[in-house]
């Protein structure tokens, strides 16, 4: 703190401000005195008549410095020449008034006072040190009882509490043999008496001999605290203050308002209270007042100091005149409005402005339109200097007048100033780094900022009244960074997934799609052209329609690896309009790429291919040209929307009637009692969701084609030119789901609680809704809107937590040299390969050689997999690759470039200094908000899917079984009796094309290695029940299945057959709660096999019946799921990142071995695993849990025993960190994929790395750790390397998984943790330990106001460190090279303006 105050003294010696770390400790009384410039003796603030500060008061000029610059209070000394003189009359030093911001005062307290943070912030530090309970300490502090501080030779004990009665008794008995006190004095004495080293030794001896867990916990906590005090040179008695620092007056100002009133900071009230009580107490002590009065006054002093430090922490908060609690010192720094988040992490910026945005379709990608008025204001100082240097004005004042009058020459100067001076545009909320980009301003009339349409996706902007802010980078370095790193032309790829984000959308897509579509019998069909230009001329002269099919000779330029070009001319069949696109495509791209229908996906592919093959500059020019072309053609096409375009399919009526009939049938079955209410509901919902799909399909089929007359006069079918279809098919606007509601049927709607209303809306929007239908509609839609509001906040909070946990992760080295990595496989869901292996490993570094089936090395370890590598992997049918990952990177602080791989936003290997942590957090958090804002588009229409009950092959191929355990059924098919069975279908090369999870109890209709045709059924099962299957043949015998107590007889009305249904323990009479209903099978081999039956099982066999292998003994009904909505989504992502243990989570086998069941205790089953060495693991599992494994089965460690959501902590413990990483990555990806959002796995891995930072010590070995400590993984690794080098026992530890909030609070940096959450707790803990913040992360550096150690700041810090170590700091040139790794920014070499480049580009005709 001393240094912090010193840096404030004189800004002149700025060089001294460089520091490498900040320490926080308790302040000793001497320290507080040394900060102080005098004692505040009076509670007065300023004189009400003269408005001058009162002497010795809270604003005293003698203590804190002069009120006006270089002027003492009485006015004897004025002006600068007297600087440093102390006036003899009023005692004020003549200096700048700014010193009133950093000169502190102090108050000498008449009686010591405990610091409330160390008392009440849990765990209470004072309580821990004294080993007393908080209640007891409070009773002493607030003068309710005495505490014995020195028992002398009496029978009393130290730390014993005595109330008044006991105290007087003891006095009578022992006289002054003992000392007992009350109040903070007593606590201070006790703290002074603690001999820290002695206590530590005692505890170290006591800990190994402690049996009880709670005692052990308490002792190790106390030991940690004592060691913290010992190591930090803090004295325990400093937690009780005898001298109170006073904040500089300008930080708690008193401002005169009009009307003679004053506005004051609450702190002044709180200080006044303290001073009043302190002075009263001094007087009472001088008068030797009665004990009880003094005691009361001391208690009041303690309370007022408590309120000053942290109001409301104890008792009722002190309130001001307006009944609201006063803001204490602690409130000043915590929370969103506190010092950290309001002023240190979020500053307001000068040279900025904001205005509404409008579209600027004529701009180039690197430009934005800036209103003249705004530009003039923003660039004022620059304009002044230009006016002066050009001799148009002689003084600044004159220049100012000219600018105010807006004289004509001012505009010329402004244009000169603005040329090549980029500005930053920002749209709130800035959810990822593309929300702030640099543009070159173009001066425009009007008052709105013009924005280039292609960057709207990145800003998530639209033109319905959005506003944007403009900032001016002032220094040359800032301009350089803006131009080379932040220019919109350098941000073509999205950092989240590496795909182009500068991709045409909406109108542009519509225009491009329209001209690339072929129409039958269009004008000029069948013409053949010699050159592309000839065809373009024909289009221009209206002899050729853009939709006509033609043939044309096309000359392509092909570049090889070295960049040499060859030309190749071919005759191509194409559509006339596609030549317009070919005309703007850069040289070196293939004609085939634009010879397709230009849907949004294809345009994105085209842009991607252009970026990868032709580089940034070409891509930018191409994107602009595409946009101009798209806008023009969309206008010319005349595509618009009309009510006639919503064609209702003729089949709709029949389909709905058929569905109604089905529903009636089910209603009848329900009335006759064949189906339960739940089943009826499920089936009805099922029917309607199927019908809805059928109607939608009929509608789309109907919309998708037109019958037209071709040139021969015959009818021909062609893809439709219906406006709505065009918009949806091209991806310009609208989705099949929305068209379905316009022209199909609206379908099932959800209630606000997520359940589906079983009566669907049969009408669509074109037919119009009845009142009831409208009501049902709004019912679900309103939920969508309410959700949105809530979820936006949630998503923002998720992003904040993610940024906080990942902020200090930066690329610090090139290669850590680790051998480790993670195994990547294709991502499979519902049998389909959703994400090919190639796509998942693109941009990663290979960790182990990738081998072909012939054992050749295809990709050696250490190669970065690029697009070419992906082709190699796909062509060779490789189904797993080991790649380097951030999770296994060995760099202690940060990560290495090899483990991270490709920088997604730039498309080459990541640079050192890239802050990958923040990028990851933004990439995950940004779509969260997008998703929350997009729920209501489909209007609450329930997107429920019909339940699967069988699988059939999609492709022809060969069957492969995975983890299959089957029993042959009498009917000749196989019955699956394993839990995680999967069936794959491989092609001739051996590549798996599809893979399906098959549930327990399915009938499999094929054998391993069989060849199957596309569409052939492979397996089937009943989705609504879970069967219990016997693997053996034998005779079934009932055990504990008693009618009326554990089971009840259900009679099927149709067949008259009766079957038992097992009752849950809740529904049983009390005497049969502990019975365990089971079927015992006496097998033909003479063994007994027991099948326990869970509640609600419907038994399918009778007592004494002979059963065959594969038969079903009973079925357990399963409920079907509700709707899938991102509501499940966002909270799901948050749960995964917070590593929450799910409710009723899956139970996993703790070790491999054989299963048996012990005697059950009340409500729980005893589950036992015995491994090969005879070790036994027992656990109690609640009876209602359905255990998947039966007696005598073998299980592997980590296998699921009882179904449920997996618990990430179990996965980490039983299967290791890579299994955990795969689980979290897949789960998070599933949520985002459901919403069609693409995020690269790397980002999720980065967050997981941060969640795995801590380990728990299980055996301390020869280190200074304790068992149960939580330590940084990097530190333990370093410690172990040291220990092993010295041949000592290493530390044994277990990796810990921390949720992101916990991980943020557990960071090494207390500044970062304090600015995140729970500020008081973090600072209290840090101060006691005397923690040093090394300022490694980004956040800490922002708070202390330095350049961040990432990006260009990394070079600065490296240079600083070198200079500090006495090495020559390197020159500016090389520093800049390091900062902007030159290969990274292709446009850095191109400092000519884009316009020149552009003109040159167009002049070279294709």
Swiss-Prot record:
It is an enzyme of class 2 (transferase). GO terms for molecular function: DNA binding; DNA-directed RNA polymerase activity; magnesium ion binding; zinc ion binding. Its cofactor is Mg(2+); Zn(2+). One of its GO terms (cellular component) is DNA-directed RNA polymerase complex. Binds 1 Mg(2+) ion per subunit. Binds 2 Zn(2+) ions per subunit. It catalyses: RNA(n) + a ribonucleoside 5'-triphosphate = RNA(n+1) + diphosphate. Zn(2+) 1 binds at residues 72, 74, 87, 90. The keyword Transferase applies. Gene3D superfamilies: 1.10.132.30, 1.10.150.390, 1.10.1790.20, 1.10.40.90, 2.40.40.20, 2.40.50.100, RNA polymerase II, clamp domain, RNA polymerase Rpb1, domain 3. SMART domains: RPOLA_N. One of its GO terms (biological process) is DNA-templated transcription. Its EC number is 2.7.7.6. Keywords: DNA-directed RNA polymerase, Magnesium, Metal-binding, Nucleotidyltransferase, Transcription, Transferase, Zinc. Zn(2+) 2 binds at residues 816, 889, 896, 899. Mg(2+) binds at residues 462, 464, 466. DNA-dependent RNA polymerase catalyzes the transcription of DNA into RNA using the four ribonucleoside triphosphates as substrates. Belongs to the RNA polymerase beta' chain family. PANTHER family: DNA-DIRECTED RNA POLYMERASE (PTHR19376), DNA-DIRECTED RNA POLYMERASE SUBUNIT BETA (PTHR19376:SF54). The RNAP catalytic core consists of 2 alpha, 1 beta, 1 beta' and 1 omega subunit. When a sigma factor is associated with the core the holoenzyme is formed, which can initiate transcription. This is DNA-directed RNA polymerase subunit beta'. It comes from Psychrobacter sp. (strain PRwf-1).
